[in-house]
């Protein structure tokens, strides 16, 4: 709903179902065991916010509050302390997720665009504990430059804040730990070969940052992806 020439209000309410992944159902090796008894996640939630735009429409700033309740939230647990084998499980009761997101989009010139966003999230399970591996702070920022009519390039920086996880010790005890925050930088270039065909190359994790999304499992270092994207 437009409140003013430069201000829009927006809101939504809805429910969603998220089925377990194939990996969660069937596992993928001896250390991640499938769980065929998993139930789908069911959530009910909504958001409300305001979008502010400049007169020329080249810059916008959005602030949104969101909240949802999740039933049967999918998490993981260790089932063998000797091999550290784990499996996906449904959490009991309802989990709560709420937070605020702010986002900026700008067109600096006809060829140069930029964006930035930040999300603050609070999570709690039915017992009041913070959900595992859900960062409170997430941020992204980037630039895209159309060098020529066919050639473009972009740069992106993303920040992931600290997350809670569970440490399983050789003595069969557990305790909560915080995974450290990390920042990644990525570069990309694309070339339009034809109206319906674009070739692209991405250099991800430019500075070869070592990080973990799950305690004990390192993620990819510096890597390159090259591909073709077509439209019909």
Model-predicted regions and their roles:
Residues 1-3, 48-52, 102-106, 116, ...:
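Residues on the lipid-exposed face of transmembrane beta-strands in outer-membrane beta-barrel proteins
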Residues 2, 8-14, 18, 40-98, ...:
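Membrane-embedded beta-barrel scaffold of Gram-negative outer-membrane proteins
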Residues 6-9, 56-61, 110-114, 149-154, ...:
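Repeated loop/turn-to-beta-strand initiation elements of outer-membrane beta-barrel proteins
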Residues 17, 66-71, 76, 114, ...:
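C-terminal beta-signal and adjacent terminal beta-strands/loops
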Residues 23-32, 75-86, 118-124, 164-171, ...:
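Flexible, solvent-exposed coil segments and beta strand-coil junctions
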Residues 30-36, 85-90, 99-101, 124-130, ...:
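Extracellular loop and loop/strand-boundary signature of outer-membrane beta-barrel proteins
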Residues 42-46, 67, 94-98, 135-139, ...:
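Residues that define the transmembrane beta-barrel architecture of outer-membrane proteins
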Residues 66-69, 87-168, 198, 207:
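Gram-negative outer-membrane beta-barrel transporters
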């Amino acid at each position: 709903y437009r409140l003013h020439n430069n201000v829009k209000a927006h809101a939504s309410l809805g429910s969603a179902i998220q089925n377990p992944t194939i990996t969660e159902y069937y596992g993928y090796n001896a250390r991640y065991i499938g769980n065929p008894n998993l139930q789908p996640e069911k959530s009910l939630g909504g958001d409300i916010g305001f979008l502010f735009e400049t007169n020329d429409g080249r810059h916008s700033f959005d602030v949104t509050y969101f909240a949802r309740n999740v039933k049967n939230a999918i998490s993981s647990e260790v089932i063998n302390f000797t091999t550290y084998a784990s499996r996906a499980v449904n959490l009991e009761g309802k989990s709560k997720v709420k937070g605020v997101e702010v986002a900026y989009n700008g067109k600096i010139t006809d060829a140069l665009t930029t964006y930035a966003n930040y999300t603050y999230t609070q999570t709690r399970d039915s017992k009041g504990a913070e959900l595992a591996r859900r960062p409170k702070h997430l941020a992204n920022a980037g630039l895209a430059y159309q060098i020529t009519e066919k050639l473009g390039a972009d740069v992106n920086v993303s920040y992931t804040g600290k997350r809670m996880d569970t440490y399983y010790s050789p003595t069969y005890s557990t305790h909560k730990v915080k995974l450290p925050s990390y920042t990644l930088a990525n570069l990309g270039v694309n070339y339009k070969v034809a109206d319906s065909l674009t070739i692209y190359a991405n250099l991800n994790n430019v500075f070869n940052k070592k990080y973990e999304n799950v305690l004990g499992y390192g993620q990819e270092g510096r890597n390159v992806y090259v591909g073709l994207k077509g439209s019909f």
